[in-house]
């Protein structure tokens, strides 16, 4: 019933485009015209669908491959080798879009250099009550309080196993897969939840992300404390190292932007001490920067998009310095242009991710970011994107 409702709303959107212009509009959709998506299609869909329904429809369309053709062809200039893998380009999709591993292949088709699914919890759970996601179009931002809604490890394992051989080939070709792990809301042993995630999905992932930074699960961010984090990550690494065979996925930790200087020093210390493979910097913020215009700006939840962009970039800069540039960083938060991506890379990120930008600009934003990034790299005298990693620290 829910899918039929979404399908009907999508059909209504097509009708609104107008009979005479339908053919031309269809052409613009299929070819991924950036201006058409940003100025017409996405605003129209936002007017018809609430944010969560639009999200579900986007995942469904992506899973079916109903996407515009990726127009930008990745050049060798954008290739990155990090975390034990080749990345065809440094722009990935952040966790939260494909929570349940339903649309991985469609996301690669969209032009992403890597895909991160999740968060996935051990047992299925509904998450927080609806409504739980809110657009702030005036601010190019979104607030969400999904609360780790998840189909659970068993269902996601089945989906990933069905495409395991395909993913192995994609990874070899420079398109790795990450899985973001979370804990169940009612769990009394968080470390065991993450360990179970490693055991079940570790053999199917190139990277595992320990998400201890979502603001929408009570007590989760407390796991970023030094003692708690050391205990948790020690168990995660033990489980990872105990996986059968030669497959050893990289382990990364995703941290919040709302950290004190001491918090960041403690995280860097634990990461270096234990030999964690990488950091994802940052998750959504619970802060509300001055100047937000959206009517729903006071809703509870994590804020993503343009407003926390600079906070994310500064956190990348700090974590790069605290780890002496020896721990690869994936930068996420407010990326919607090549300039945004390059700022994070120069601050210390080896790779970047986006998600909220899809809400406002649609699939063509992926090619736009890559095209602009390549142009800026050339303009600033870099031969390869890897030459720009941490460049601000060498000035």
Curated annotation (Swiss-Prot):
Mitochondrial intermembrane-side segments: 31-395
Modification note: The uncleaved transit peptide is required for mitochondrial targeting and proper membrane integration.
Catalytic activity, as annotated: (S)-dihydroorotate + a quinone = orotate + a quinol
Membrane side Mitochondrial matrix: residue ranges: 1-10
Enzyme active site: 214 (nucleophile)
Molecular function as annotated in GO: dihydroorotate dehydrogenase (quinone) activity
A Pfam short name: DHO_dh
GO cellular component annotations of the record: mitochondrial inner membrane
EC top class named in words: oxidoreductase
Subunit note: Monomer.
Name of the protein this chain belongs to: Dihydroorotate dehydrogenase (quinone), mitochondrial
Organism, scientific name: Pongo abelii (Sumatran orangutan)
């Amino acid at each position: 019933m829910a899918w039929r409702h979404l399908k009907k709303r999508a059909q209504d959107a097509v009708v609104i485009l107008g009979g005479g212009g339908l053919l031309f509009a269809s052409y613009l959709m299929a070819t991924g015209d950036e201006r058409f998506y940003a100025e017409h299609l996405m605003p129209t869909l936002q007017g018809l669908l609430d944010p969560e329904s639009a999200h579900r429809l986007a995942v469904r369309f992506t899973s079916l491959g109903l996407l515009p053709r990726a127009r930008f062809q990745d050049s060798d200039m954008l290739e990155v080798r990090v975390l034990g893998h080749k990345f065809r380009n440094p722009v990935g999709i952040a966790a939260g879009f494909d929570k349940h591993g339903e649309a991985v292949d469609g996301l690669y088709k969209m032009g992403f250099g890597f895909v991160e699914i999740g968060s996935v919890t051990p047992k299925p759970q509904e998450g927080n009550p609806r409504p739980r996601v809110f657009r702030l179009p005036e601010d190019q931002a979104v607030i969400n309080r999904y609360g780790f809604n998840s189909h659970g490890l068993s269902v996601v394992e089945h989906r990933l196993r069905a495409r395991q051989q395909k993913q192995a080939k994609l990874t070899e070709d420079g398109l790795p897969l990450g899985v973001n792990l979370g804990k169940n809301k009612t769990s009394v042993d968080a470390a065991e939840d993450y360990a179970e995630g490693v055991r079940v999905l570790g053999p199917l992932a190139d990277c595992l992300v320990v998400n201890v930074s979502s603001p929408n699960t009570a007590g989760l961010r407390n796991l970023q404390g030094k003692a708690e984090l050391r205990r948790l990550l020690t168990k995660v690494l033990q489980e990872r190292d105990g996986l059968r065979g030669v497959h050893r996925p990289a382990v990364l930790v995703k941290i919040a932007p709302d950290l004190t200087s001491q918090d960041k020093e403690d995280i860097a210390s634990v990461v270096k001490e234990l030999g964690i493979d990488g950091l994802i910097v940052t998750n959504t913020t619970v802060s509300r920067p001055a100047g937000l215009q959206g009517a729903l700006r006071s809703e509870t939840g994590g804020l993503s998009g343009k407003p926390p962009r600079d906070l994310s970039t500064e956190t990348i800069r700090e974590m790069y310095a605290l780890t002496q540039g020896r721990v690869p960083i994936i930068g996420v938060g407010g990326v919607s242009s090549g300039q945004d991506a390059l700022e994070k890379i120069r601050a210390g990120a080896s790779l970047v991710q986006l998600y909220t930008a899809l809400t406002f600009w649609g699939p063509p934003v992926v090619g736009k970011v890559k095209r602009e990034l390549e142009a800026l790299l050339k303009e600033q005298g870099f031969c390869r994107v890897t030459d720009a990693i941490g460049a601000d620290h060498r000035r």
